Amino acid sequence: MAEKYITEEQRAKCRKVADAFAELYELTDVMVADAGRFGFVRLQWFSEGEGFDSAMAFSDCLELFEELWRIWYEHEVLTPVLGTPLAELDYDEIFQTLSKDRQEEILEKKRYFIALCDI
């Protein structure tokens, strides 16, 4: 019998996380695929003819959540400042330049994702 790299419990939890971030897959060049006994794989930076430039396997739902949250956060923080000097700052520094309302919206979105994932 082939070795399994993810428990059934973690498979179900990772599926919830992958589904919760469905909107991210429409915003950026990223997706999560169920890789069976190997867990879930985050694929990023697609190029036709080349495939995905980055792949990372996950067998823990919290690690998958943190990875997808990081990508969502970076997209939301960086996209509005592309082409400006602020784009040279790191993500947390850019976050600090946002209005308090926008900062709260982003933090609320993290709480929303946590609730969807039930973690």
Regions found by a protein language model. Give the residues of each.
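Short, exposed beta-strand/loop patches in secreted or surface proteins that constitute
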Residues: 21-23, 30-34, 56
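Short intrinsically disordered terminal tails
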Residues: 1-5, 111-119
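Negatively charged, low-complexity tracts enriched in Asp/Glu with abundant Ser/Thr
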Residues: 2-28
